[in-house]
Each structure stands twice: as C-alpha cells, then as structure tokens.
Swiss-Prot record:
Keywords: Mitochondrion, Ribonucleoprotein, Ribosomal protein. This is Small ribosomal subunit protein uS14m. It is found in: Mitochondrion. It comes from Brassica napus (Rape). The gene is RPS14. It comes from the Eukaryota. One of its GO terms (biological process) is translation. Belongs to the universal ribosomal protein uS14 family.
Length: 100
C-alpha cells in the first residue's frame, strides 16, 4: 500500500514542478487589478484548466519506508518511529542519542 501512495505522491510532485511557472503566472495575472477584467477572467479560466494534481497544495510529505503521511521529518522524509529505530541501530550517519 505504501508503494502506491508514494508513487502517487511522486507523480504529484513531478506535475507540480512541471506546471509551477505557468500556475504562478496565471495567478499573478488573476490578482493584478490593473489588467482589464476580461483578461483576468481569461487567465482564471486557463488556471482552472490546469491539472488538479499540478498544485503544490496537493503534495503531501510521506514516509519513504512506510508511506505514513503524519509526523514525518522533512529533512529525512522518515516517520518518527522509523527514525527512532534507525537512529538507535546506528543506521543514520551523524545521529546519536542526546544526553546531558
């Protein structure tokens, strides 16, 4: 199940990167009050015709080993329990249990 979710998320990331500039351009045209309203409406229509998954709002950080969407470290892209297990085994370079 996690492979399916991770592959779906990966496809969304690729689509979002592909359409990022076009989406930002259309949004800027829509929000510009100096442009005529028909031109803004035309760009709003073009924005609505872009693929749904091309928005970064639909991208979700997921654990690369379990596919879990919550409590995932952005830097390592690992769920906190998996991170703890890998760190305690010494599988993550430079990570050790803190003590003071």
């Amino acid at each position: 199940m996690s492979e399916k979710q991770n592959s779906r998320d990966h496809k969304r990331r690729l689509l979002a990167a592909k359409f990022e500039l076009r989406r930002k351009l259309y949004k800027a045209f829509c929000k510009d009050p100096d442009l005529p309203s028909d031109m803004r409406d035309k760009h709003r229509y073009k924005l609505s015709k872009l693929p749904r998954n091309s928005s970064f709002a639909r991208v979700r950080n997921r654990c690369i080993s379990t596919g879990r969407p919550r409590s995932v470290s952005e830097f390592f892209r690992i769920y906190r329990i998996v991170f703890r297990g890998l760190a305690s085994r010494g599988s993550l370079m430079g990570i050790k249990k803190s003590s003071w």
